[in-house]
């Protein structure tokens, strides 16, 4: 259960006595987080055992990571085709998305991720997720075809993540159901090492 910060009272005590407890649990999912202004209170986070993204996600990559993985200021000039096709042109930029049907984007992302994974061999989870911004997804003919078949741009995203999950089966990939990817796809299903973070705003 999640409660607001105001729903509990913490009374400071000098001594706390607890009975002997032996309790083991296997969580239904590996990472649990809720995000609100209450998270700024460290006691609240501790009480509800909310995890810090930096403790779980490689290089603290937990949301809106497209531009961290393939920065547009590094790749955009030479490879504008990596980025969203909108109103007749590819538009690299900090908030641009990727053209997820372009195999060169997949290859470039694999190279970047492989380097990140090698630098952090003891960590398993990373987010590969859209940049912040609505209606910025790629509308090239290939992406539009997948979007129409899947009934949502989330289909393109899950297909891309599934390919990454197959390429790196020992890693876990997180992504977002957020804004234009909020609705689930009709056909494709995420692989076991792909998890979806619901971000309903």
Feature map (PLM): residue ranges:
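Short, surface-exposed basic-aromatic patches at helix termini and helix-loop junctions that form
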Residues: 187-193
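Feature activates predominantly on carbohydrate-active enzymes
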Residues: 1-159, 163-170, 174-177, 193-199
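Alpha-helical scaffolding within the catalytic cores
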Residues: 178-187
């Amino acid at each position: 259960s999640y409660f607001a910060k105001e729903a509990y009272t913490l009374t400071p005590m000098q001594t706390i006595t607890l009975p002997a407890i032996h309790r083991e649990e296997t969580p239904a999912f590996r990472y649990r987080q809720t995000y609100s202004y209450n998270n700024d209170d460290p006691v609240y986070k501790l009480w509800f055992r909310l995890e810090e993204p930096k403790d779980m996600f490689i290089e603290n990559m937990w949301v809106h990571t497209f531009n961290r993985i393939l920065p547009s200021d590094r790749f955009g000039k030479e490879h504008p085709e990596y980025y969203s096709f909108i109103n007749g042109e590819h538009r690299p930029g900090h908030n641009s998305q990727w053209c997820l049907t372009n195999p060169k984007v997949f290859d470039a992302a694999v190279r970047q991720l492989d380097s990140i994974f090698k630098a952090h061999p003891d960590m398993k989870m990373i987010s590969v997720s859209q940049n912040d911004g609505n209606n910025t997804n790629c509308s090239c003919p290939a992406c539009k075809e997948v979007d129409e078949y899947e009934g949502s741009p989330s289909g393109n995203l899950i297909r891309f993540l599934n390919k990454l999950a197959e390429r790196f089966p020992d890693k876990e990939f997180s992504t977002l159901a957020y804004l234009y990817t909020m609705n689930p796809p009709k056909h494709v299903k995420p692989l076991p090492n792909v998890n979806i973070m619901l971000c309903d705003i």
